[in-house]
């Protein structure tokens, strides 16, 4: 049996709980950086390795090695009678789930059975964020509740990944208009993804706007800002590294929206001491008086969409909850 977990914490707890089989930690961050469709596998993973290297100050050779070993371990699924996917409801997890469903949908499973554990709450935990909160007994109690992955789930997961990795994000909107019941948390997660596109109001995506609002409200130190962001935007499931990437983007360009002090590497003991201060441009953007993209340009991947230049090709219309052609704004 092979268990695929979305984090080291959950995998460690699962091992201590003596769940039968081997445990593979899925360490990708497919919610961030390029995931273009139509790219050969080797090129795709090289692209991902370069992104992870740039984003998290890693050696590109190390990132490439880790991703290669992860894919090689995944390819050994045929040696197991059952593969159990352990995921959660948030965008971070749902993207990894649909990638894996798409991956398995393209392969002959033979005698291997696919199972899924995917939850958004747990009895007795009021503020449930993820499987990493569970102790050994709690995690073990989920194992008998796993359900066989159906052909409908494989098909929907494959279709969802193809939409996410497309250069045309309207494919996601088309998917959300269909029945997504086989994956009950998918619709909410992908809607949150669409809200990451630059808004008509000020050029900020929802994640950026929420983070900047929290800083403006006095959450200047990262040790206060990060938990406040998690409480404000739990459906994204972003860790500290992903939130820092968003903040760094806001601090760049000819007219930065914030200034940063004491920003140390994320594995440093001093990391939580980083502080942020909103600038006058940041205040103007929050008020809707200025536009972040027009002030600073954009070079950002959202799934398979590469937004670049002095205008965003796609914008999010908050009032109508839909994407629009940014070149017509």
Task: Please provide the spans of the model-predicted regions.
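A short alpha->loop->secondary-structure connector
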Residues: 20, 99-114
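A structured, charge-rich N-terminal accessory region that forms the first stable segment of a protein
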Residues: 1-65
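Charge-enriched amphipathic alpha-helical scaffolds
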Residues: 209, 230-264
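Short, conserved secondary-structure transition motifs
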Residues: 116-141
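Accessory beta->alpha helical hairpin/"wing" motif in late/C-terminal subdomains of nucleic-acid enzymes
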Residues: 241-244, 256-329
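Short acidic, hydrophobic short linear motifs in intrinsically disordered regions
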Residues: 219-230, 239
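Long, hydrophobic/aromatic-enriched structural stretches that serve as scaffold segments
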Residues: 56-106
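A conserved mid-domain beta-alpha-beta active-site/ligand-binding segment of alpha/beta enzyme cores
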Residues: 136-216
């Amino acid at each position: 049996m092979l268990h695929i977990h979305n984090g080291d914490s959950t995998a460690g707890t699962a091992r201590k709980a003596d769940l039968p089989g081997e445990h593979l930690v899925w360490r990708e961050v497919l919610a961030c950086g390029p995931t273009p469709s139509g790219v050969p596998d080797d090129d795709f993973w090289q692209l991902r390795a370069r992104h992870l290297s740039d984003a998290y100050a890693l050696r590109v050779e190390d990132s490439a090695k880790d991703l290669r070993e992860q894919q090689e371990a995944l390819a050994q699924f045929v040696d197991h009678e059952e593969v159990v996917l352990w995921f959660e409801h948030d965008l971070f997890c749902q993207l990894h789930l649909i990638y894996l469903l798409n991956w398995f949908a393209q392969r002959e499973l033979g005698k291997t059975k696919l199972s899924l554990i995917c939850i958004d709450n747990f009895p007795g935990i009021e503020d449930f964020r993820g499987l990493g909160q569970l102790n050994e007994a709690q995690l073990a109690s989920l194992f008998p509740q796993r359900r066989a992955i159906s052909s409908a789930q494989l098909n929907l997961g494959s279709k969802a990944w193809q939409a996410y990795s497309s250069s045309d994000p309207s494919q996601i909107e088309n998917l959300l208009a269909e029945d997504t019941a086989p994956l009950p948390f998918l619709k909410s997660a992908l809607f949150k993804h669409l809200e990451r596109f630059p808004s008509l109001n000020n050029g900020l995506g929802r994640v950026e706007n929420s983070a900047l609002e929290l800083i403006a409200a006095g959450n200047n130190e990262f040790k206060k800002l990060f938990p406040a962001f998690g409480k404000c935007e739990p459906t994204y499931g972003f860790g500290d590294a992903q939130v820092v990437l968003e903040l760094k983007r806001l601090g760049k360009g000819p007219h930065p929206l914030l200034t940063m002090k004491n920003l140390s590497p994320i594995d440093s003991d001093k990391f939580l001491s980083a502080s942020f201060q909103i600038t006058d441009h940041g205040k103007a953007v929050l008020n809707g008086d200025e536009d972040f993209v027009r002030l600073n340009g954009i070079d950002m991947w959202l799934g398979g969409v590469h937004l670049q230049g002095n205008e965003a090709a796609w914008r999010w219309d908050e009032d109508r909850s839909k994407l629009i052609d940014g070149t017509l704004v």
